[in-house]
Amino acid sequence: MRKRVTYKIGEHDLILETGYLAKQANGSIYAEYAGSAILATICASGQAQEGLDYVPLTVDYNEKYYAAGKIPGGFIKREGRPKDKEILVSRLIDRPMRPLFNKEFGREIQLVPTCISTDMINPPDILAVIASSAAVHISDIPFDGPVAAARVAYKNGEYIINPTFSQIETADMEIVVAGTKEGITMVEGGANEVSEEVMLTALEKAHEMIKSLCKMQEDLRELAGKEKLPLVPLEAELENKQAIYDEAFPRLSKTLYLSTKMERREESDKVKKELAEKYAEQLEDEIQLKLFNALFEEMEYNILRTNILDKGLRVDGRGTKDIRPITCEIGVLPRPHGSAVFTRGETQSLGVVTIGTVFDEQIYDDIEGDRRENFILHYNFPPFSVGEVGRLGTGRREIGHGNLAHRSLYPMVPEREKFPYTVRVVSEVLESNGSSSMATVCSGTLSMLHAGVPMKKPVAGIAMGLITEGNDRYAILSDILGEEDHLGDMDFKVAGTADGITGFQMDIKIAGVSPEIMKNALAQAKEGRMHILGIMNQCISAPNAELSQYAPRVEMMTIPEDKIGALIGPGGKNVKAISDKYNVTINTENDGTVTIYSKDGTSDLKGAKSIVKGITSDPEVGMVYDGTVKKIMDFGAFVEILPGKEGLCHISKLSRSRVEKVSDVLKEGQEIPVKLLEIDKLGRLNLSYVDALEERSK
């Protein structure tokens, strides 16, 4: 039976409905807001596995082209593999929901939110989070939700809840916040140098909306909720648990504080291996082996957290506010247009910049419409960066981390009008032990400055952590390691300039974080960011004055809009001829902006610009032009003064003395100066060779 609930947000009703579409799924929700609609389904496999130490959850958000009344471009008219945007929204849904599933459920879970309608005014991602949570909440799958999300934009001192695409585009800050009615569990977004206070206020406003949306889902569960399926807890206990604990705990308390990540891993694995061999017969049982591994993880968890809270002792011996040693180096590669290595402790990123033309822009074709991007950032995380063997390729993690770094740097990248190039930054993570995405922000800044990209200001990033015990006891950690990220209660990445925040991402593993902790974490993050910026500025503080000799050069000009056709020529004939002759690439915009790019050192930008100017300019009486003799006649010579524009230089205008034959003075193909004397009633150009010579000799 169809059941629905509604909630007014702004000018439109948010509708959540179940019992009509996709009824064979464990749970399904049709969510609608304005002209956008999401169908979210959740299914669980039939067989439960005992003793799983993770949640086997897959989130596959997808957008259908028909949602926007479009047919996919290209030869194949079917939706293909997930686009980056779909992967990012899948992560947006996964991150706040995954901690609320119980590992003891033991079944594979697949969540499929599908965008089946969009008005191209309201972003569908927030609707997808709400629909996904509601689908799980009303289903028979155990879930400690519900979860909801809200987007907040900030512009001119005002906060806008769930803004439209156009409002987001002009906002000074845009964040997506997710959480439960108890607290915030996830934040991500970008900004144009906003203060920490602006962000805190935005979080508060978002959580008020989240609480209302969670209540809405609870109302729907009362109407249509299913009885939850039972959990499959591991009933067995680890044999010889106390003996294993007594032998391992003191040894781990030492090995976990060795100086490097590799040493800590090797020595901890050695302790584990020795005890596994000692109790080998017992650990032949699969359940006993899982309990054995779980005990080691629990010991590491307790050792690290207790020492931080009781002694302020971190894995590598730092204090809670200390930043690992940082080194920066620019110009590390000979041929690329810009390069830099940023190293922070055992995390290292090689940033490489390539300067391209407008023809290198990233083109997006999705349900939001076609658009182009002239700033591209790609993040690569090869397995060797953590000393492991694995496949190379781009996964969801790479796309997510690259997006965070892109958001953080984008506000400081110059506008196309000031820097008419395409900029591609590639971050090669060469070592990783905590916050490689923030190292990418730093190496990206350094490599762009080295490449001569006129960034508005340098950007740096830092990852913060949180260890809590109860409501009042906590420690905020600056520049966290991988171990602290894994065992902590919060991972909070903040990037920005000396004057404000540009990018941030937060994931919280506990029920929520108080405003006081958030305020202190942001303040401590600012201290760390300023420290990192200071070191980066010692390496390079301003963009290089010149682009690399291997980078393309550009000339820009504006022509009358009614001359665009004349420049292009029939079938692009004129543009192609100029491009081939001067070894350049020419781009013409509808507003008359013409951009001429050099291809290499043999390009003649000035020559190409002169020809473009000539084609698109009207001849002026009294001007002297450098022309080419096209044809010799008995009565004079036809001279081309501008591309496609010829005039007659009469034999009487070749010299002050009598000329018997034109060929005595001029030859076809000869380049000569001529002065435009007049344009007659028929539009014909009358030229003078002798007047031009006299004028230039003055």
Swiss-Prot record:
Leader sequence range is none
Q: Where is the KH domain?
A: 552-612
Question: GO terms for molecular function, please?
Answer: 3'-5'-RNA exonuclease activity; magnesium ion binding; polyribonucleotide nucleotidyltransferase activity; RNA binding
Q: Which residues cross the membrane?
A: none
Q: Which organism is it from?
A: Treponema denticola (strain ATCC 35405 / DSM 14222 / CIP 103919 / JCM 8153 / KCTC 15104)
Q: What is its EC number?
A: 2.7.7.8
Protein family (similarity comment)? Belongs to the polyribonucleotide nucleotidyltransferase family.
Q: What is the lineage of its organism?
A: Bacteria, Pseudomonadati, Spirochaetota, Spirochaetia, Spirochaetales
S1 motif domain span: 622-690
Keyword RNA-binding set for record: yes
Q: Which reaction does it catalyse?
A: RNA(n+1) + phosphate = RNA(n) + a ribonucleoside 5'-diphosphate
Q: Is Nucleotidyltransferase set as a keyword in this record?
A: yes
Q: Kindly state one GO CC term assigned in the UniProt record.
A: cytosol
Per the UniProt entry, what is one GO biological process?
A: mRNA catabolic process
Q: Please, which domain of life does this record's source organism belong to?
A: Bacteria
Q: Which Pfam families match?
A: KH_1 (PF00013), PNPase (PF03726), RNase_PH (PF01138), RNase_PH_C (PF03725), S1 (PF00575)
Q: What is this protein called?
A: Polyribonucleotide nucleotidyltransferase
Q: Which PROSITE patterns match?
A: KH_TYPE_1, S1
Residues noted as binding Mg(2+) in the record, renumbered to the chain: 485, 491
Q: Which InterPro entries does the entry mention?
A: ExoRNase_PH_dom1 (IPR001247), ExoRNase_PH_dom2 (IPR015847), ExoRNase_PH_dom2_sf (IPR036345), KH_dom (IPR004087), KH_dom_type_1 (IPR004088), KH_dom_type_1_sf (IPR036612), NA-bd_OB-fold (IPR012340), PNPase (IPR012162)
